[in-house]
């Protein structure tokens, strides 16, 4: 058949297969957009945005804590907080929809860059899905998405003749949205440097426009409330030996090829990137950028998304080389109908990837694990007529308290080293773990109240003091304690006097009744709470524990299944609840089976916890349920 005779049929088929593949790429990539992590950063960003909207000014000093109050605060993401607070204030879930929109645009740019180098939508699709899967755990609602998006934008426009003219306005915006602008400057600087080296080697005109663009972009980044001092924020992480470096996102990436784990997906991106390098089609710039970012990602897992996006063109070349080899062996798969069938199959797979991904209802709560925050204790604090002024709080809850209990100074939050010094970080970890000398640190900071996880060491230590701290509010997530001395003690009110009869109050009531052994009262309160808020995950955990104490195996299984119906992919907390409940019943086999279902492949699973679970499974004396 001649080319002219098949064109009327093949051209529409090619367009159709390409359109279906593009749709499949975006649908499939978006399925990875909802990680199961406690997105603690969003709350302080929203609190900052709220402050700016309400006061009409950008705070240059910290207005939220009692440990750094009045100290200089470089809020490099103030504009993100301003935008997202406006969305959140209209409706909380608008922040989730806005983040999803940014991610779809990000994946579209990654796919476009991958297609441009590979000229294959199949290769571009495989690359984009692999990139999305490797980024999955890091895609919570926070400003770093802007850096990923703008990095993809730079990579997709670098070869535009007038691209350098776009850089100054882009970096003026970027420097007010996220400190990752410094990476972007490094990216365009690397590009200009390699262009210069090639020009000198080949005796061609120097890339003056590129260097003018780099210099103007660096200057434009200074257009922000802190001027060129904004550069201090990214530069302080180059040699990061602060106690904040103990945070798990700054730890090195593990070695694994298991695609179910964050590390396995990262190393598979590395593998396809290497295939792309060996294809002989890679540019020196793409190789150099991948080399820089892979070192960053290996040294700190938080940089995995930057590497994946930066290496996407090379990975696409790798997939393209594999597809080319397959076509040479099986020429028939290159014809139009097999391509159309492959496109349809890709769309079907993309739809199946959404299995178990429940975006509705309450997408923001699902995206941030919102039910894990101390909403009841925060409401109690906000309702107090004379709240504490020197609260010691759990690190990951500081931003939440800034938003939900405004006006109550906090001890620390996830603004980390952009505000708090290393000494405070060391004090925090010592106090939280009730290490030697914690009492002196409490006195030095004037702590008059504590809000920490219920099972934390410091909560137990405070209740064992000679003058025990008084519990104002407690539920499975958190405990709020007040110092034994001082006028605050006499003014403490029962939660029922300050809080409405909502799911939080009923959860607290059920939790306390269960601990006292009053199982009927606990069950009644928890069932009422579950009817009121079926998305409060900790209610299901408490109902499992009540069933365990009643030795009701069927009821325990029922509430496990109910929790999985609400949160099909919130495996770890649900199976952790089930494991503890079965263990309390003395049901070794069921406990072991639940323990085996806990997934340990995420980047925010501490090595100690991973090793403990694996050791318990390995040393168990019973066999799993068949």
Residues covered by each model-derived region:
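Membrane-interface transmembrane helices that cradle and orient dolichyl/undecaprenyl
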Residues: 152-165, 271-281
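Membrane-interface alpha helices of multi-pass inner-membrane proteins
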Residues: 28-29, 131-135, 152-157, 164-179, ...
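Specific aromatic-rich, kink-prone transmembrane helix
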Residues: 109, 131-134, 146-163, 188-195
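Transmembrane-helix signature of polytopic, membrane-embedded enzymes
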Residues: 23, 110-133, 149
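C-terminal luminal/periplasmic domains and tails of membrane-associated envelope-modifying transferases
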Residues: 358-400, 404-411, 416-626
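Transmembrane-helix motifs of polytopic, lipid-linked glycan transferases
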Residues: 97, 101-117
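Transmembrane catalytic cores of multi-pass membrane glycosyltransferases
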Residues: 41, 53, 179-278, 308, ...
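Short hydrophobic/aromatic helix or loop-helix immediately within or flanking a transmembrane segment
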Residues: 52, 67-93
């Amino acid at each position: 058949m001649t080319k002219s005779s098949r064109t009327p049929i093949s051209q529409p088929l090619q367009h159709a297969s390409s359109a279906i593949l593009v749709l499949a790429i975006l649908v499939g990539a978006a399925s990875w957009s909802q990680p199961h992590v406690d997105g603690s950063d969003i709350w302080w960003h929203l609190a900052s945005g709220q402050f700016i909207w309400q006061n009409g000014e950008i705070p240059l000093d910290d207005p939220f804590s009692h440990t750094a109050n009045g100290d200089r605060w470089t809020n490099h993401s103030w504009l993100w907080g301003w935008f997202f607070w406006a969305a959140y204030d209209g409706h909380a879930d608008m922040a989730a929809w806005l983040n999803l929109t940014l991610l779809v645009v990000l994946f579209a740019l990654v796919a476009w860059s991958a297609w441009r180098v590979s000229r294959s939508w199949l290769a571009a699709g495989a690359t984009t899905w692999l990139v999305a899967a490797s980024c999955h755990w890091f895609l919570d609602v926070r400003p770093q998405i802007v850096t990923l998006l703008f990095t993809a934008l730079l990579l997709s426009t670098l070869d535009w003749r007038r691209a350098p003219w776009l850089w100054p306005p882009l970096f003026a915006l970027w420097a007010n949205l996220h400190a990752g602008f410094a990476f972007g400057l490094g990216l365009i600087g690397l590009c200009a440097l390699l262009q210069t080296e090639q020009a000198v080697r080949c005796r061609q005109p120097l890339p003056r426009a590129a260097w003018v663009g780099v210099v103007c972009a660096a200057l434009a980044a200074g257009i922000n409330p802190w001027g060129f001092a904004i550069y201090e924020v990214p530069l302080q992480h180059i040699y990061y030996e602060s106690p904040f470096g103990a945070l798990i996102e700054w730890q090195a990436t593990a070695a694994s090829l298991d695609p179910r784990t964050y590390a396995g997906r990262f190393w598979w991106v590395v593998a396809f990137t290497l295939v792309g390098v060996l294809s002989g089609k890679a540019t020196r710039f793409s190789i150099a950028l991948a080399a820089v970012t892979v070192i960053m990602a290996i040294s700190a897992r938080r940089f995995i998304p930057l590497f994946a996006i930066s290496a996407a063109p090379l990975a696409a070349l790798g997939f393209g080389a594999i597809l080319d080899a397959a076509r040479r062996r099986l020429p028939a798969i290159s014809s139009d109908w097999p391509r159309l069938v492959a496109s349809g199959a890709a769309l079907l797979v993309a739809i199946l990837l959404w299995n178990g991904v429940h975006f509705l209802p309450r997408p923001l709560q699902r995206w941030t694990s919102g039910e894990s925050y101390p909403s009841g204790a925060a409401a109690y604090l906000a309702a107090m007529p004379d709240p504490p002024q020197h609260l010691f709080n759990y690190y990951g809850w500081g931003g939440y308290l800034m938003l939900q209990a405004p006006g109550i100074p906090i001890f620390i939050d996830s603004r980390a080293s952009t505000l708090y010094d290393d000494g405070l970080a060391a004090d925090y970890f010592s106090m939280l773990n009730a290490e030697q000398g914690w009492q002196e640190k409490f006195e030095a900071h004037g702590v008059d109240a504590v809000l920490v996880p219920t099972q934390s060491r410091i909560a137990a230590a405070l209740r064992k003091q000679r003058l025990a701290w008084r519990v104002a509010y407690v539920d499975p997530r958190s405990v709020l304690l007040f110092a034994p001395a001082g006028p605050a003690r006499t003014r403490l009110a029962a939660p029922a006097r300050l809080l409405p009869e909502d799911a939080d109050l009923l959860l607290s009531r059920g939790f306390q009744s269960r601990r006292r052994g009053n199982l009927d009262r606990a069950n009644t309160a928890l069932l009422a709470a579950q009817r009121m808020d079926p998305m409060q995950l900790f209610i299901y955990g408490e109902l499992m524990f009540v069933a365990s104490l009643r030795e009701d195996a069927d009821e325990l299984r029922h509430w496990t299944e109910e929790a999985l119906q609400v949160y099909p992919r919130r495996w770890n907390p649900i199976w952790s609840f089930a494991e503890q409940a079965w263990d309390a019943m003395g049901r070794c086999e069921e406990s072991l089976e639940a323990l085996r279902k806990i997934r340990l492949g995420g980047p925010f699973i501490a090595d100690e916890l991973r090793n403990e679970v694996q050791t318990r499974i390995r040393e168990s004396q019973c066999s799993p349920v068949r």
